[in-house]
From Swiss-Prot:
Biological source species: Cavia porcellus (Guinea pig)
Important for agonist binding: annotated segments: 116-121, 425-429
Protein name in UniProt: Histamine H1 receptor
Keywords: Cell membrane, Disulfide bond, G-protein coupled receptor, Glycoprotein, Membrane, Phosphoprotein, Receptor, Transducer, Transmembrane, Transmembrane helix
Gene label: HRH1
Chain segments carrying region Disordered: 259-285
Subcellular location per the Swiss-Prot or TrEMBL entry: Cell membrane
Amino acid sequence: MSFLPGMTPVTLSNFSWALEDRMLEGNSTTTPTRQLMPLVVVLSSVSLVTVALNLLVLYAVRSERKLHTVGNLYIVSLSVADLIVGAVVMPMSILYLHRSAWILGRPLCLFWLSMDYVASTASIFSVFILCIDRYRSVQQPLRYLRYRTKTRASATILGAWLLSFLWVIPILGWHHFMAPTSEPREKKCETDFYDVTWFKVMTAIINFYLPTLLMLWFYIRIYKAVRRHCQHRQLINSSLPSFSEMKLKLENAKVDTRRMGKESPWEDPKRCSKDASGVHTPMPSSQHLVDMPCAAVLSEDEGGEVGTRQMPMLAVGDGRCCEALNHMHSQLELSGQSRATHSISARPEEWTVVDGQSFPITDSDTSTEAAPMGGQPRSGSNSGLDYIKFTWRRLRSHSRQYTSGLHLNRERKAAKQLGCIMAAFILCWIPYFVFFMVIAFCKSCSNEPVHMFTIWLGYLNSTLNPLIYPLCNENFRKTFKRILRIPP
């Protein structure tokens, strides 16, 4: 056996041992990488699906006019945050996991951390402001409709994103404000405050625990309000005829232009004139007055007792409705004290029923309706003017109440969608923030695989959100089918 010049058997054996050690060291680093390949493939698929689904949501909102609503602006904000998580945060996290070390340098590390914290926080805040919007829409439907504009919603969304971007300050400039408590660990991508307990606890409370508790409180109130409204409607539907039945009775009724032996206490101004003695004289007209039960009111007193009171109505030729005069006279004959006793303000909540549906009456509505009741009856042309004003106010009131009812139906479906979004949000993020608090107080309790699992469980929320929209929203479902060319 020959040797190379200058190479002794001892030195050759030492070289072979060193080469063997180097190969074994290489195998020790590549073997875990190969074992992680199936996991890397799965996580890469999750990232691609997250990007595709959130792009689909954004395109659906942009292309479908039915989705151009104020409420969907919050969905767009949530989808943008989830898109950043899927397109930027997930791929860099997969590379970090695959190599078991950060190899992209400190600048890209800070960029990745910034995008991770900002997008995740923006996603949480988007769910929070969406919850507030649903809460106000259900609790204050008429009042909030005037306030609920795209401009105000956009300003709220902008504020949520600006608050989320505040994370950039401690991530990039912690060492400028606070003295570092420890040296950065080699081949690790982590913030300068990773071992600062008080800061981590404070941010966890502000970013997750406080918004989550508020969202749960809001959603409980939403659930109770929707449930109460549904119970009111069931009560009304079981006790009152529908508007179509009333209309059928009206068409079959025999209408006389003059009451049999009675003079109508409230004449149509076009059918009345006033003579010198101040007596109303009927005038010929093609319009007729008939008694018609047009609506009923469901009231709830302070003790929680629910009762109904019928509201007799008058239908006037072209279909306008107003309260019958006998009801008006009973109100006008009340003294000042009894009027105060029976005023609308004494009832905490009232619901009016049209076509079998119950709608809340707001203070503005009731004050408008009660206006003509508070004064004394007038005669002649003044009573005709009062009649026109009262009819117009009743029409406006019923229009607002009907709009409120339609809005309430939409908000009931939106509350269901919000419930699914909140459930996915809490289930995905609470393990991470619980473990986040544990390692903040017990640094020896840190477990890298568990920590990585909780992080990716939070990322998975960005994948689930766009799946929830079509499941809980018919317009999203139809739009998705149209875009993907799926037959209905």
